[in-house]
Every structure is written in C-alpha cells, then in structure tokens.
Amino acid sequence: MTTNGFDINDLKRRMDGAKESLRYELGGLRTGRAAISMLEPVQVEAYGSHMPLNQVATVSVPEPRLLSVQVWDKSMVKAVETAIVNSNLGLNPATEGQVIRLRIPELNEERRKELVKVAHKYAEAARVAVRHVRRDGLDIVKKDKMSEDEQERASGEIQKVTDAAIADIDKLLATKEKEILTV
C-alpha cells in the first residue's frame, strides 16, 4: 500500500533487514556443535584487504564436533589461521598442509547460559530496530495528508507488520536458545 510518502513494503523490507541481521548474529554464536556459519564473521587479511573466510577457503563439517577449512592458496594458510585465532571464537586451529582443523570443545553449563544471554541481547537489538522502523512509519502516516480513517487503517497495517516481525524474531531466538541449551 502506497499513499503519498507511506509505503508498507518499504517498512517490511527494513524490518526484514533487522531479522536477517539477527539471523547472521545468531549464526556466529557457538553451540557446541560444528556449523559452517560459526566462521562467517571471520575476516582474513588477504591480498592487501580484509576478505570473508569463504572467499579464500572452503569450510566443511566432516564430523559433528569438527570444522575443516581447506585453504585454496598455500601462502594464505598462516593468515587464515591467524584470523581464526583472533576471531574470539575460542577455537584452536591444527594445521596439516593446506587443511586447518578446528575441534569444537564441549560447552559447560555456565558458558551455555552466557551464550543464551548474548542471544537475548541480539534479539532485543533486532526488536528495537523493528520498533524504530514502526515509529518511522507512524511518523510518515501522521505527516501525510490522509483522512483519519486512512491513518487508522495504515497504523493498523504497520502494527500487524511489526507484530509479525517481532514474532519471527522471537521464533529465531527460541530456536537458537534450544540449540545452545541442548547438550
């Protein structure tokens, strides 16, 4: 629905951006099981710039508690190893030629609870972002030259989209929380 300056699809797109950002952040949280997404935030100093790990190596999960990083260029092995160590993921690389193996240690109960708190913090940041988008939409509706009925309808539609986005965020959080707490 587009009326003057108000576009519900633009608001949906911006809210989807907040959800995608949350999905990315949660993907970087370690759960005790190996997942390729754990290494997504790792940036490697390569060829004079910072590059995502997946642009200089192939990451695979040969075992449930093991990540394997196959570096394409032999000269980049040390840089990839350094990037993994500096990523604060708590992983210790074991290098064999061009293959770097990362054993995923068991998470203790205290660490699991810390990770759940971090996940909640990420989810709250996403909810705040969605609420900001809602506020922006409501501001546009108020400033638009709409009848009172149109303003009510637009405000209701904005609230529906907001509620759906927050429900999606809560679902993502619940899934990640269950994943973290499963021993």
From Swiss-Prot:
Keywords of this entry: Cytoplasm, Protein biosynthesis
GO cellular component, one term: cytosol
A single GO BP: cytoplasmic translational termination
InterPro entries: Ribosome_recyc_fac, Ribosome_recyc_fac_dom, RRF_sf
Superkingdom assignment: Bacteria
MF term (GO), any: ribosomal large subunit binding
Presence of the UniProt keyword Transmembrane in the record: no
Subcellular location: Cytoplasm
NCBIfam families: frr
Function, as annotated: Responsible for the release of ribosomes from messenger RNA at the termination of protein biosynthesis. May increase the efficiency of translation by recycling ribosomes from one round of translation to another.
Sequence similarity: Belongs to the RRF family.
Protein name per UniProt: Ribosome-recycling factor
Phylogenetic lineage: Bacteria, Pseudomonadati, Pseudomonadota, Alphaproteobacteria, Hyphomicrobiales
